[in-house]
Amino acid sequence: MSRAILHSPANLPCNPPPWGSLVAVDVSNGSIRWNEPLGSTAETWLANPAAIVRGTPNLGGPIITAGGLVFIAAAMDDYLRAFDIDTGAELWKGKLPAGGQATPMTYRLRPDGKQFVVIAAGGHGKLGTKLGDSLIAFALP
């Protein structure tokens, strides 16, 4: 048994892009509120100058803050992103030193203190993202 990602002869995923999305579902009725392709092939081994694709394969989950921000890395392009929970608009992204195929966490040192979002940037061998061994913290404004 092999646990590998199946690629086409062009070394791309077999299904058409986008290959990964961040989707918000209204749990009261099951409808999709918004669906945004997650990541870009521009800085990955999938890059093709003739066709930059939004929505890379991804592995990792989001966190949601009380202020309505959705933080997720997961994509193959080594960015941690923040999205608006109501609209799906990408509000911010920060470059990671390696793949962020992990679920971020958030914390405060004091109840009235600054909030931080932290993610392990270790990469993922099967996805072909850059490997590393960093913990990266971003302070929320």
Summary of predicted features, one role per range:
Residues 1-141:
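A fold-level detector for beta-propeller and closely related beta-sheet-rich head/sensor domains
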